[in-house]
UniProtKB/Swiss-Prot annotation:
Signal peptide: none annotated. This is Iron-sulfur cluster assembly scaffold protein IscU. GO terms for molecular function: iron ion binding; iron-sulfur cluster binding. Belongs to the NifU family. InterPro entries: ISCU, NIF_FeS_clus_asmbl_NifU_N.
Length: 126
C-alpha cells in the first residue's frame, strides 16, 4: 500500500497540531476513536461571535492516514461556518488525500471529530 503525496506531506508536516483550553466557551472539542485499529483523534475548534470557525487544532494518535486526515480537516474548516463544516464528508477527505480503501476509516474519524467538536461547542453555548 502506497500513500499519496498529500498524505505523506500532512503526515511529515502536520498543520495545526495542539490544543485549546476546553473551559473556554468559544471552544468545541471532539474526541473520537477507532477501537479496531487504535486510532484516537482529538479535534478542537475556536468559534467567533458570528459562528465562524476562526481556528482549529488537533492531536491524533494513529497511523499516517489518521494524522493526515486530521491535519487536512483543520485547514479546511478554518473560516467556515458551523453548517459548512458539518457538511464536510469523509468521502471528501478520502478523495482529497487519495486514501486507499483500507484507510477509509481515518476519514470517517475526521468527519466524526468535526461533528463532535461542533456538538460540544453548541452544547456549551445553548
Amino acid at each position: 500500500m502506497a500513500y499519496s503525496k498529500k498524505v505523506i506531506d500532512h503526515y511529515e508536516n502536520p498543520r495545526n497540531v495542539g490544543s485549546f483550553k476546553t473551559i473556554d466557551a468559544n471552544v468545541g472539542s471532539g474526541l473520537v476513536g477507532a477501537p479496531a485499529c487504535g486510532d484516537v483523534m482529538k479535534l478542537q475548534i475556536k468559534v467567533n461571535k458570528n459562528g465562524i470557525i476562526q481556528d482549529a487544532c488537533f492531536k491524533t494518535y494513529g497511523c499516517g492516514s489518521a494524522i493526515a486526515s486530521s491535519s487536512l480537516v483543520t485547514e479546511w474548516i478554518k473560516g467556515k461556518s458551523l453548517i459548512e463544516a458539518e457538511n464536510i464528508k469523509n468521502t471528501n477527505i478520502a478523495e482529497e488525500l487519495d486514501l486507499p480503501p483500507v484507510k477509509i476509516h481515518c476519514s470517517i474519524l475526521a468527519e466524526d471529530a468535526i461533528k463532535a467538536a461542533i456538538t460540544d461547542y453548541k452544547n456549551k453555548n445553548k
